[in-house]
């Protein structure tokens, strides 16, 4: 964790520079929101179908900024360059420890459910890598070092005698280019997430090495968090945003056909590929009201603390008494 936290000063400064144009002179009307891909259907609906949300563009506006993963958004939140953003429990907790971030979890996007999809690491069919132990001295791709998938990934490696800090070369490879990186030999193994996993599986030539559910079942992958100072200063504005996140989730689940189009537009992924998994039993899980599962998040924080990745942490610090999905 120290190696990740040592980057905070530089990374936070970079986040401010990247988002310098996102001034907060009209903070009461505008929210600066970070997003990423995949699995943020409520936000994709808000971006692609804004007319479906009566308050959006009228009562308040959103300034959207895309990131590769949750860890850079944590840094941007801590630097005050974002107001709300997609987060993973580990990246958010690292923001508290390394960046003095104070935030509220206001909604939840996706989680791993029994029998559903679990983020996994793949190798080529002809790879000599057969077990996790075989990853020693290999180049491994991960979406973001220190992001949401890093925690259970690192725990699985350690359990199998591989030190993720010393025994492998860990490189950042975005989900969208994971398949290409693997097939071209730039990495020996790489993490796969939907819809890119479905696309790669359809082509063949790769196989699953391990999935995160083997170490940590029922993972809360991504949630929505807002800076506590921003929420406390602008409660009505954030309530409007959380109402729209709630509404967006309901729209996504109620109209799968339109959601396929929305996600296709946002991810530039063909509808036939998305149709193989999106909002089906083999997909990630979604709460119908985008409600955060604080009990599950606490269990994840406890596991991270028990393995030395984080100090002991109480999820209660992330709970706002009234501003949390579902809001009507």
Regions inferred by a protein language model and the residue ranges of each:
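Sec/Tat signal peptide C-region and signal peptidase I cleavage site
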Residues: 21-27
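Bacterial N-terminal signal peptides that target proteins for export
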Residues: 1-12
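Secondary-structure end/capping motifs
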Residues: 232-309
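Short, glycine-/small- and polar/acidic-enriched structural segments
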Residues: 29-162, 169-172, 188-194, 218
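Conserved C-terminal helix/tail region of periplasmic/extracytoplasmic solute-binding proteins
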Residues: 301-328
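Bacterial N-terminal signal peptides
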Residues: 10-20
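Pocket-lining segment of extracytoplasmic ligand-binding domains
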Residues: 90, 170, 176-265
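Solvent-exposed, polar/charged alpha-helical surfaces in well-ordered, non-transmembrane soluble domains
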Residues: 71, 75, 79, 93, ...
């Amino acid at each position: 964790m120290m190696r990740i936290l040592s980057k905070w000063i530089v990374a936070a400064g970079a986040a401010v520079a990247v988002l310098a144009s996102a001034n907060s002179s009209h903070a009461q009307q505008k929210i600066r929101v970070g997003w990423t891909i995949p699995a943020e259907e409520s936000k994709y609906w808000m971006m692609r179908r804004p007319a479906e949300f009566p308050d959006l563009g009228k009562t308040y506006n959103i300034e959207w900024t895309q990131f590769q993963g949750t860890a850079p958004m944590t840094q941007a939140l801590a630097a005050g360059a974002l107001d709300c953003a997609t987060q993973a429990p580990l990246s958010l907790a690292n923001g508290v420890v390394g960046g003095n971030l104070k935030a509220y979890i206001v909604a939840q996007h996706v989680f791993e459910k029994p029998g559903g999809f679990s983020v996994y690491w793949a190798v080529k069919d002809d790879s000599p890598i057969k077990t996790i132990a075989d990853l020693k001295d290999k180049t491994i791709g991960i979406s973001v070092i220190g992001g949401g998938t890093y925690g259970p990934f690192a725990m699985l490696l350690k359990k199998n005698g591989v030190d993720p800090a010393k025994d492998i070369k860990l490189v950042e490879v975005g989900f969208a280019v994971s398949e290409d990186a693997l097939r071209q030999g730039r990495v020996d193994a790489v993490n796969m997430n939907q819809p890119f996993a479905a696309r790669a599986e359809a082509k063949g030539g790769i196989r699953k090495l391990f999935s995160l559910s083997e170490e940590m079942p029922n993972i809360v992958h991504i949630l929505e968090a807002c800076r506590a100072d921003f929420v406390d200063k602008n409660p009505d504005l954030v309530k409007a945003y959380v109402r729209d996140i709630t509404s967006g989730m309901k729209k996504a689940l109620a109209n799968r056909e339109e959601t396929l189009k929305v996600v296709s537009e946002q991810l530039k992924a063909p509808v036939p590929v998305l149709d193989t998994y999106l909002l089906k039993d083999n997909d990630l899980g979604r709460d119908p009201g985008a409600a955060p599962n604080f009990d599950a998040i606490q269990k994840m924080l406890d596991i991270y603390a028990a393995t030395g990745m984080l100090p002991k942490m109480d999820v209660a610090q992330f709970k706002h008494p009234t501003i949390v999905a579902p809001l009507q």
